[in-house]
């Protein structure tokens, strides 16, 4: 049996599909697994041992359309469910199952605060697409695999961070997901432990501000490492503090203790850390304004008088980090 899994973006969503790959391999041993994603996210799956072929596109499925048709797939698992993935399904003469995105329910939740979403994690909803071919969930969490060049040697870190540290992920794709810079600096001061800040090049400036405010016990690694190298640093950390972003899901895949911080988005969307390490916590603001503000976190606060982050004090975050 030859199966094509389709998920184009983004990093976190792709990580959340990894149980689908695993259960296909384990429950259909002779299956040939192909995966189609965007080229810029290739590294997330590049070293996955259960993927027989990883296909990528830059923008349009026409880039690989003819080659995919030649593969004669037996089944397509569409975990993106958008116009682009529907074009893939239409190109291939194969049975397909499609993930239900529940866009209407999410719109009702963000617009009117009517929560009609099922109490079910998106991973379990991804896995339900396999029931028609006799494959079931295994309750084993997420997977993440690194290549040899992705591993960051502890001896390559600044002195003081080589024997253990707290990882704080300050990055995030949208502003409504970002715990404020000054509050993050206060968390660093309160925990009194070595801290490595993780994020992309766009987060370097905020990281520098945190180091300036919190002192030499904080190392700003934002933009210094690739995504996979950042995952390697997560692997070496004692605990991970993170916004709702791709590295949060990678940390859960590594079974780290994850302290996840939620602002404009909410765990009820079904995207919380999936089966992370023991002692993980979800922290949300206690505030008068109504969350969620948007599905993606690209909208923040309706009322200028309210700032939801005022309802999540640094002392609360620090206490979660220091908890046994």
Question: What are these model-predicted stretches?
Answer:
Residues 1-324:
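Catalytic machinery of carbohydrate-active enzymes
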């Amino acid at each position: 049996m030859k199966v094509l899994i389709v998920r184009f973006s983004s990093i976190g969503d792709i990580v959340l599909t990894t149980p689908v790959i695993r259960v296909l391999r384990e429950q259909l041993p002779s299956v040939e697994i192909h995966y189609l994603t965007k080229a810029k996210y290739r590294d997330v799956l590049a070293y996955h041992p259960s993927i027989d072929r990883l296909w990528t596109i830059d923008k349009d499925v026409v880039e690989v359309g003819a080659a995919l048709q030649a593969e004669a797939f037996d089944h397509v698992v569409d975990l993106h469910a958008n116009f682009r993935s529907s074009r893939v399904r239409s190109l291939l003469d194969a049975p397909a199952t499609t993930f239900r995105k529940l866009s209407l329910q999410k719109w009702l939740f963000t617009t009117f605060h009517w929560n009609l979403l099922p109490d079910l994690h998106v991973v379990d909803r991804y896995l339900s697409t396999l029931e028609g071919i006799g494959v079931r969930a295994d309750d084993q969490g997420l997977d993440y695999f690194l290549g040899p060049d992705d591993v960051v040697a502890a001896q390559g870190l600044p002195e003081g961070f080589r024997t253990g540290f707290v990882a704080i992920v300050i990055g995030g794709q949208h502003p409504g997901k970002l715990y404020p810079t000054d509050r993050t600096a206060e968390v660093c001061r309160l925990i009194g432990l070595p801290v490595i800040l993780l994020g992309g090049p766009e987060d370097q400036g905020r990281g520098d501000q945190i180091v300036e405010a919190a002192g030499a016990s904080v190392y700003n690694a934002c933009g210094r490492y690739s995504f996979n190298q950042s995952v390697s640093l997560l692997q070496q950390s004692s605990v991970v503090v993170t916004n709702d972003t791709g590295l949060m899901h990678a940390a859960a895949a590594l079974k780290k203790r994850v302290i996840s911080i939620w602002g404009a988005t909410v765990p009820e969307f079904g995207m919380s850390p999936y089966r992370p390490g023991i002692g993980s916590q979800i922290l949300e603001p206690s505030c008068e304004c109504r969350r969620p503000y948007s599905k993606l976190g690209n909208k923040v606060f309706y009322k200028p008088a309210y700032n939801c982050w005022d309802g999540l004090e640094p002392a609360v975050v620090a206490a979660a980090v220091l908890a046994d």
